[in-house]
């Protein structure tokens, strides 16, 4: 056998090749050590690829870390990968630097009065875990009385937990222990003093977390809150300054002084059956331009059944118009024309008044919901409008050539055929148009080409 000839591969048997064994290696503190190294690089200015300008202060960071921690930075860097980012002026530099430290280290130590600023910045950066945790801290402090205790809870520390995947609160060594969040759900907010630094700070904190608390109060309101009239109770505390404290959603028991001053509820009064008649007006824009006020007609149910007459009341409370004198306003039809009745009507003395009427209450059984002031009712609105126009000889459709007016649109269409020979004719091709705008458009496009009887061609 030649030495250059390759040897055939040896046949492998299942007995010679055992199944491969896998080894699982885990480092529990790898993420924390990695964050610590990244934070050290940030502080030393190593491998930083973005500069953040906040109120004239420049901070260096890593794009990958910012994009992973904040959806705001993720979208901003995705749209424009710029080496320098300028944040809005509403973001405080100290609060942003604290949140940047929280992103890299997973913990944050801050004074209590700086918590609203950090909450505002976290909301702007869309760091919702931090927003939720800060809101929970504020609720726990309010429940435990840590805010109104004269500044005893002066500092807080936010740390991250790998087990829960969020943020948790750790009290300072000189801070009173706070109650768990589970106990705050069934507890009632205590009253705080009306003056002092504690109440002012509480008002500031309540304003900053107003958006977050509204969502939770909306979900908890159907469980605890009962429908009550809006009133300011004497037992609810008010913060000093121009920022009032929001009242708690939980119902509170009124005090003895309050119960003595509050009037007892009035007995229920049976509402009278009144049908509201609202006049419809097509040309409402012209009415508003003229400065006219909206008129409201009220149709009493009892009078309509017994006497079948209408009483017109002014919406401003001017009183009821008498039948002998002229009313202070004139009823109008769909097109803004004055409705004439009595001696001035086109039909002579005693002619019924016409106008669109909107019936309130339950719809009639026959389905005729569109009524006229004369008493007739129609199933569809066009028939009611046609009835009013024909009764008053309204002619809203006018001819633009001879200034004749017609009651219905198809009458105007038939009338336009009489002007077929006198309409606009193209001097180049001889084509005639009824509308001047169409004629002008055609004249600009026509180049003298003839128009055959079987085909029209546009250029």
UniProtKB/Swiss-Prot annotation:
Q: What does this protein do?
A: May be involved in transcriptional regulation.
Question: What residue spans carry the region label Disordered?
Answer: 178-200, 212-274, 293-356
Q: Where is this cross-link: Glycyl lysine isopeptide (Lys-Gly) (interchain with G-Cter in SUMO2)?
A: 285, 293, 368
Q: Which InterPro entries match?
A: BTB/POZ_dom, SKP1/BTB/POZ_sf, Znf_C2H2_sf, Znf_C2H2_type, ZnFinger_BTB_dom_contain
Tell me the GO molecular function terms: DNA binding; identical protein binding; zinc ion binding
Q: Does the entry feature the keyword Transcription, yes or no?
A: yes
- Pfam families recorded: BTB
| Chain ranges of the BTB domain | 48-112
Q: Where in the cell is it found?
A: Nucleus
Taxonomic lineage from the root = Eukaryota, Metazoa, Chordata, Craniata, Vertebrata
Question: GO terms for CC?
Answer: nucleus
Q: Where is the composition biased (Polar residues)?
A: 178-189
- Tell me the gene name: Zbtb9
Q: Give the main location.
A: nucleus
Which SUPFAM superfamilies does the entry mention? beta-beta-alpha zinc fingers, POZ domain
Keywords for the protein's UniProt record, in alphabetical order:
DNA-binding, Isopeptide bond, Metal-binding, Nucleus, Repeat, Transcription, Transcription regulation, Ubl conjugation, Zinc, Zinc-finger
**What is the protein named?**
Zinc finger and BTB domain-containing protein 9
This protein's record includes keyword Protease: no
Q: Where are the zinc fingers (C2H2-type)?
A: 397-419, 424-446
User: Where is the secretion signal located?
Assistant: none
